[in-house]
Design a protein with these regions (language model features):
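Preference for extracellular/luminal or secreted protein segments
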Residues: 1-30, 81, 271-339
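Solvent-exposed loop/turn segments at secondary-structure junctions
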Residues: 16-20, 41-45, 75-80, 123, ...
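Second-shell residues forming the walls of enzyme active-site clefts
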Residues: 2, 47-57, 155-309, 313
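Short acidic, glycine-rich surface-loop motifs adjacent to enzyme active sites
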Residues: 27-46, 125, 140, 215-235
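Hydrophobic faces of well-ordered beta-strands that scaffold small-molecule active sites
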Residues: 8-15, 34-38, 69-75, 123-127, ...
């Protein structure tokens, strides 16, 4: 792979609505972006999504040196279900999933995962591992208000998180534990506001239990939140924090997989130049940059290339992150040599 192709592997870019348009096709080929996601809800069903996913995979020869794409979606359930229509089940919210016995949830997750596989989707931005304290749901905009949490007890939530991961893994869907180190005790939603601050969570917080269980279960991706955690690193958003990524997630919990950003086109980071967002995330130890409009990825990729050209240590970070992503793709059978 060339340096630009390795940089491209670091990006998971949003598709426009439910299609692969000409501008997206051009950007994916030109900047070698290695993963995509359905960022808008669609009701075109399994067959319609499969048509789009197949069109993306057909770009691999020209875009990514023959390496297939992670094709992703937010398929949590409840209000957060991107893919619907013929062939897709209506997935209950995590609150309702949390009422199921974990063994039952595992079976249902396998069924939902098979629908994703049939649609050509091989990566789910789920499960949510955030814990919302009982009685605070209405004040918790990103998770509790939307019924995205499995519950209020970290141990019980962890069991359901693992069940979801195991069910999806059985049928070949990679999963993402999110939003580390937790959005269950904030009020603002980082998608729509900046300066979201958690004043409670600590580096050894009991509410990190679901993430630790997910890591022990082999989850390949962990998504980092865009909130600030005053008691871990008050000076940086979590996605830009070495203390959060290296100190807590990698060193303390032992995660060796792909660290994924929450969307770096969210309002929480809107005041930071796109290129700087990408640099700060990789500098902090992140691997895969998730973002919405694909046009924003172009200046991000340019910024990474310029920094790598003048900084050997940063270039090594890029190469290490690209390797982690390629290892995840190998595990998912997406490399030409995957057995």
């Amino acid at each position: 792979m060339t340096e630009s192709q390795r940089i491209g592997q670091l990006f998971n870019v949003g598709l426009e609505n439910d299609r692969l348009d000409a501008a997206s096709r051009k950007a994916i080929i030109g900047d070698h972006f290695g993963s995509v996601w359905f960022r808008a809800k669609t009701t075109i069903g399994v067959a319609g999504v499969r048509k789009v996913a197949d069109a993306v995979q057909a770009l691999a020869t020209d875009a990514t040196d023959g390496v297939d794409f992670f094709v992703a979606a937010n398929q949590e359930g409840g209000l957060i279900q991107a893919l619907a229509g013929p062939g897709f089940s209506t997935i209950p919210s995590a609150v309702d999933q949390g009422k199921l016995d974990p063994s039952v949830l595992e079976g249902r997750a396998a069924r939902w995962g098979q629908q994703l596989i049939d649609a050509g989707v091989n990566l789910d931005f789920a499960p949510v591992a955030d814990v919302v304290p009982k009685g605070t749901e209405a004040q918790n905009a990103p998770i509790g208000q939307l019924r995205r949490e499995y519950g209020s007890d970290p141990v019980a939530v962890g069991k359901h998180v693992v069940a979801f991961i195991r069910g999806m893994t059985k049928v070949g869907v990679a999963t993402t534990a999110k939003h580390f180190p937790g959005l269950g005790r904030v009020e603002g939603n980082t998608d729509f506001t900046s300066a979201v601050v958690d004043t409670v969570t600590t580096a050894h917080d009991p509410y990190r239990e679901p993430f630790a269980r997910a890591v022990s279960a082999g989850v390949p991706f962990v998504m980092i939140s865009l909130a600030t955690y005053d008691r871990i690193d008050p000076d940086h958003l979590a996605a830009f924090s070495t203390k959060v990524i290296h100190g807590v997630l990698r060193r303390d919990i032992g995660f060796g997989g792909v660290v994924m950003s929450d969307s770096l086109t969210a309002d929480a980071v809107s005041e930071i130049a796109p290129g700087q967002r990408a640099i700060d995330f990789i500098d902090a130890g992140g691997d895969m940059i998730v973002l919405g409009p694909i046009a924003v990825a172009v200046p991000m990729a340019d910024a990474l290339a310029k920094r790598a050209a003048s900084n050997a240590a940063f270039r090594a970070r890029i190469d290490h992150s690209a390797l982690r992503i390629l290892e995840a793709k190998d595990a998912a059978g997406l490399l030409p040599c995957s057995g």
